[in-house]
Amino acid sequence: MTAQRNTLDAAITRSASALFAAQRPDGHWVFELEADATIPAEYILLRHYLGEPVDAALEAKIARYLRRIQSARHHGWPLYHDGAFDISATIKAYYALKMIGDAPDAPHMARARAAVLAAGGAEAGNVFPRIQLALYGAGPWSAVPTIPPELMLAPRWFPVHLSKI
């Protein structure tokens, strides 16, 4: 057990030393933030919704990233590397690529669309892509679930209190 403990302590010391060596003088670190498809897709969707000027170079990078992480196995986008198909992530990535300018009949887009349709269509996605699609007029607002405003008046012990949602 002592040998394992020494090995663990040495690994922790090496890891901490490597992190401290990478730390900037003002105390922060700069590392690549790897995310699933939803973060860059939502960024594109938000920029377009806000009417921000198109940054073609940035959009090209994001489009390449989204195309690169599309699953060859299920043709959609997972929530983590090599993960299972996630319909909501796939809807967002597909729509972001479409917004960037990828043709809907491009092979990667056709495969993604077929995967979404096979999983029940856009209506099978969670509330977030439904809201985004409704914002762009690509989906009905009636598909977005509503919360009755009276729930705000419910006491904390109530089973469906806002603090529990």
Model region roles, listed by residue range:
Residues 1-165:
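Preference for long, amphipathic alpha-helical scaffolds in soluble/luminal domains
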